[in-house]
């Protein structure tokens, strides 16, 4: 039986779903760059906190990254606007191909579907309920439980321990190259969702078992 570990942010959940608010708050000419830097710093802070053994929940990394971007872009954000941005990040939309993919795969008795996320379980549950996809998941495995962030190998081992699955039967499904490389290096199978042509894998580390462009292609693999 295959056990699928779906990453959340950047795989199921579109982190650029914040653009409409940023268009209003920082201007259309800055919004995309702001959103990109926000995501990059969010991940950077999670990596650094994990390496430094200074764990804080993912929403703290998100908030700290937002503060960095506000300062970096030299924009003025009111307290209400700041709160709106943080709230929106906890209610981001699913990608358009997510529901069809999960609905199809969930019908297969030989596949178990889990989420494996850097986000706290309650935040992921909220996103899944908002996106009407919570019913497809057997459980949500969060790094909060071990206070280490992906791509630390302890996270992938924790997934195996929590789900009782063997490494050879476990598949990470992710749109994030660092996650795919981390899981592949650990020994898991992996599928990289390369949604845009400009995405690249780093020139070292594990390689994905499969590379696809949309989640609609996942159905043919299992």
For the regions a language model picked out, list residue spans one by one.
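Asp-based, Mg2+/Mn2+-dependent phosphohydrolase catalytic module
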Residues: 4, 103, 120-222
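Short, surface-exposed acidic
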Residues: 28-37, 73-83, 167
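Active-site neighborhood of HAD-like aspartate-dependent phosphohydrolases
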Residues: 1-43
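Substrate-recognition element of Asp-dependent hydrolases with the DxDx(T/V) motif
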Residues: 80-94, 98-130, 137-143
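Alpha-helical elements of Rossmann-like donor-binding domains used by nucleotide-donor carbohydrate transfer enzymes
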Residues: 20-21, 37, 64-68, 84, ...
């Amino acid at each position: 039986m295959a056990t699928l570990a779906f990453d959340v942010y950047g795989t199921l959940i579109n982190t650029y779903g914040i653009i409409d608010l940023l268009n209003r708050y920082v201007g259309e000419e800055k919004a995309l760059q702001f959103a990109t830097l926000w995501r990059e710093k969010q991940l950077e802070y999670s990596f650094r906190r994990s390496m430094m053994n200074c764990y804080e929940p993912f929403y703290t990394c998100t908030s700290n990254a937002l503060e960095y971007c506000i300062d970096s872009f030299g924009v003025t954000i009111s307290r209400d606007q700041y709160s709106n941005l943080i709230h929106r990040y906890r209610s981001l939309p699913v990608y358009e191909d997510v529901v069809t993919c999960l609905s199809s795969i969930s019908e297969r008795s030989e596949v178990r579907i889990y989420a494996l996320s850097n986000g706290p379980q309650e935040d992921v549950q909220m996103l899944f309920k908002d996106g009407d996809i919570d019913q497809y998941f057997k459980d949500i495995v969060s790094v909060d439980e071990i206070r280490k962030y992906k791509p630390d190998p302890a996270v992938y081992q924790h997934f195996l321990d929590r789900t009782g699955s063997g490494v050879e039967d476990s598949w990470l499904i992710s749109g994030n190259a660092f996650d795919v490389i981390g899981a592949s290096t650990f020994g898991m199978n992996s599928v990289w969702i390369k949604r845009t042509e400009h995405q690249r894998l780093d020139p070292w580390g594990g390689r994905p078992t499969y590379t696809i462009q949309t989640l609609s292609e996942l159905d043919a693999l299992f």
